[in-house]
Amino acid sequence: MNPFWSMSTSSVRKRSEGEEKTLTGDVKTSPPRTAPKKQLPSIPKNALPITKPTSPAPAAQSTNGTHASYGPFYLEYSLLAEFTLVVKQKLPGVYVQPSYRSALMWFGVIFIRHGLYQDGVFKFTVYIPDNYPDGDCPRLVFDIPVFHPLVDPTSGELDVKRAFAKWRRNHNHIWQVLMYARRVFYKIDTASPLNPEAAVLYEKDIQLFKSKVVDSVKVCTARLFDQPKIEDPYAISFSPWNPSVHDEAREKMLTQKKPEEQHNKSVHVAGLSWVKPGSVQPFSKEEKTVAT
């Protein structure tokens, strides 16, 4: 007999006997086993303690409501859009140029062609808040204080808040401030003036007011060639007429043809014309009769 099978049969017999004892209630309990004590591995000497990762701090927000990470780009885009609007408006007699050092500062000049301030050339600077367009309205300060009811006689600042008490984004624009600065020289307003003397003279003694306006225009014209108050490569400056420089530039401006006119002349229109040259009446050409 195979010893393996003999061992298996004996073990079966022993197992059956143990089961019978269990059924009869004679149960022997085995002593509890003592589990070995668990120990953590030792920590290396140069190891850093493991700390819980901190949650990322919320992105800081700038005063204009945009995230600080892209706030400067948003401001730059807004100012670029504003300057594009100024160019498209083509404000008569008003020229502006953003500063080289800061997009929040624009240099400008206003030419007055008729009215009480005729022949006036007034240079100014526009200061834009750093939280534009959610802050206050831009400030406009003339380089030389102009004698005007709405211009501070000391600082030269124009009362812009009169027209823009609360600056509304997407509704108010910088070109409107420039248009307002031009309009105040053609339509005089004396209510709540920054220069009370100018307001009183305009209401009580218009001749004396005109005399002081003429003097103010002469002062601005005499100091037109002064160096800009703010040192900046893009600051607007004037120089006396130089024929070797300005004659050529003037000739180019006067002889420059519009692109539309050049395009119309280059396009050849084929077909018959029934309009006599120099006439706008159709069928004005005289028909030539052939003698038979």
UniProtKB/Swiss-Prot annotation:
Protein's GO biological process: apoptotic process; early endosome to late endosome transport; endosome organization; endosome to lysosome transport; lysosome organization; positive regulation of protein binding; positive regulation of protein phosphorylation; postreplication repair
- Where is it chiefly localized? cytoplasm
Q: Which CDD domains does the entry link to?
A: UEV_AKTIP
Spell out the Polar residues composition-biased ranges.
1-11
Which ranges does the record mark as transmembrane? none
Q: Name one GO cellular component term.
A: nucleus
SUPFAM superfamilies per the UniProt record, alphabetical: UBC-like (SSF54495)
Q: How does it sit in the membrane?
A: Peripheral membrane protein
The record's annotation in InterPro entries points to:
Ub_conjugating_enzyme, UBQ-conjugat_E2_core, UBQ-conjugating_enzyme/RWD
Pfam families documented for this protein: UQ_con
Q: Where is the composition biased (Basic and acidic residues)?
A: 14-23
List every stretch annotated Disordered: 1-63
Q: Where in the cell is it found?
A: Cytoplasm; Cell membrane
SMART domains referenced in this protein's UniProt entry, alphabetically: UBCc (SM00212)
Q: Which residues carry this modification: Phosphoserine?
A: S30
GO molecular-function term, one example from the UniProt record: ubiquitin conjugating enzyme activity
Query: Locate the UBC core domain: which residues?
Result: 74-222
Q: Which UniProt keywords apply?
A: Apoptosis, Cell membrane, Cytoplasm, Membrane, Phosphoprotein, Protein transport, Transport
Give the family from UniProt. Answer: Belongs to the ubiquitin-conjugating enzyme family. FTS subfamily.
Question: What is the protein's quaternary organization?
Answer: Component of the FTS/Hook/FHIP complex (FHF complex), composed of AKTIP/FTS, FHIP1B, and one or more members of the Hook family of proteins HOOK1, HOOK2, and HOOK3. Interacts directly with HOOK1, HOOK2 and HOOK3. The FHF complex associates with the homotypic vesicular sorting complex (the HOPS complex). Also interacts with AKT1. May interact with FHIP1A.
* Protein task: Component of the FTS/Hook/FHIP complex (FHF complex). The FHF complex may function to promote vesicle trafficking and/or fusion via the homotypic vesicular protein sorting complex (the HOPS complex). Regulates apoptosis by enhancing phosphorylation and activation of AKT1. Increases release of TNFSF6 via the AKT1/GSK3B/NFATC1 signaling cascade. FHF complex promotes the distribution of AP-4 complex to the perinuclear area of the cell.
Q: What is this protein called?
A: AKT-interacting protein
Its lineage opens with: Eukaryota, Metazoa, Chordata, Craniata, Vertebrata
